[in-house]
From Swiss-Prot:
Transmembrane residue ranges: 34-53, 54-72, 126-146, 152-172
Superkingdom in the source lineage: Eukaryota
Gene name tied to this protein: TVP23B
Membrane topology: Multi-pass membrane protein
GO CC annotation terms, alphabetical: Golgi membrane
Pfam families: DUF846
Family: Belongs to the TVP23 family.
Compositional bias segments (type: Acidic residues): 1-21
UniProt source species: Bos taurus (Bovine)
InterPro entries (alphabetical): TVP23-like
Official protein name in the record: Golgi apparatus membrane protein TVP23 homolog B
GO biological process annotation, one example: vesicle-mediated transport
Record keywords, A-Z: Acetylation, Membrane, Transmembrane, Transmembrane helix
């Protein structure tokens, strides 16, 4: 697997194909992509259900493991390549330049002033709820499998944590930007808090 370089090789761009834009925009509160919204939750929820219930319906660990891994793989591909782009206008991917150097690209589609908001609020809630909640559940399953000595399931659970955690990390990077932007945001926030506290202390002293 390609790893991100220690140098800042990430790119934050907002380049999406123009053909993906539509002229007639439904209301932002409506679900504009019902099929994408369904499959955004279907594969990841199905993997969790199979993990919890498979031993009740099948005594074959191999069959359960293969089913869960297939569902997790389908979920990873669908969320990374389809649902994120359609539901929230975000996309992350990797490319190799002419020098053979790996670059991670985090895209965020920005609406033009004429179009207004291009992301449905309902779809955004569905997307982020599924994206955050399911990896948290897999982390809980990992601790449960570890402490209950279910060693054979640990590899399956770790696969769930890695695949769904990778999508969560990628889309958070798309949403908030690169490490430089995160540092800038933190510095700006601390500066504002300090300025606000200093201003408040000055006003209090003046009042006395």
């Amino acid at each position: 697997m390609l790893q991100q370089d220690s140098n800042d090789d990430t790119e934050d761009v907002s380049l999406f194909d123009a053909e993906e834009e539509t002229t007639n925009r439904p209301k932002k509160s409506r679900i504009r992509h019902p099929v994408a919204s369904f499959f955004h939750l279907f594969f990841r929820v199905s993997a969790i259900i199979v993990y919890l219930l498979c031993e009740l319906f099948s005594s074959s660990f191999i069959a359960c493991m293969v089913t869960i891994i297939l569902l997790l793989s389908c979920d990873f591909w669908a969320v990374k390549n389809v649902t994120g782009r359609l539901m929230v206008g975000l996309r992350w991917w990797n490319h190799i330049d002419e020098d053979g150097k790996s670059h991670w690209v985090f895209e965020s589609r920005k609406a033009s002033p004429q179009e207004g908001k291009t992301v449905s609020e309902a779809e955004s809630r569905i997307f982020w709820l599924g994206l955050v909640a399911c990896p948290v559940l897999w982390v809980v399953f990992a601790f449960s499998a570890l402490f209950s000595f279910r060693v054979k399931w640990l590899a399956v659970v770790i696969m769930g944590v890695v695949l769904q955690g990778a999508n969560l990390y990628g889309y958070i990077r798309c949403k908030v930007g690169s490490r430089k932007n995160l540092t800038s945001m933190a510095t700006t926030y601390l500066g504002r808090q300090f300025l606000r506290q200093t201003t408040g202390d000055t006003q209090t002293s003046s009042g006395e």
